Amino acid sequence: MAQHDKLATYGYSFQTKLIAALLIDKLFTKQIIDILDVKYFESEANSWIISCIREHFTKFKVAPTLEVLKIKLQDVTNDVLRASIVEQLRESWKHIESTDLDFIKDKTIDFCKNQTIKGA
């Protein structure tokens, strides 16, 4: 997958804020969950987080809490990956009140729709 086919095009902070938006905005998560693919993320930690959010949201119709993610994290046997996931969640949580989350959501929806059209 080419660089422009990944959310890395928008940078690390963008992806971190996207995770924050998914964790706190149920309506946004519902809107994008079916077209947001883990392959759009370069980082294995981000892919793991997105996968957990998708799985949990599909089953329970709400994003997982940090407590749920902490419990799921116990299944990760790779210490380096586990540390990376914890750090990513910390960084994401710092952005839950960012003033540009609406912009992040709009850009993500556009990106995912374009990727879906490309793949059709």
Task: Go through each PLM region and give its residues.
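Noncatalytic partner-interaction/assembly domains of nucleic-acid and motor enzyme complexes
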Residues: M1-F111
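Short, intrinsically disordered, charge-balanced linker/junction segments flanking boundaries
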Residues: I117-A120
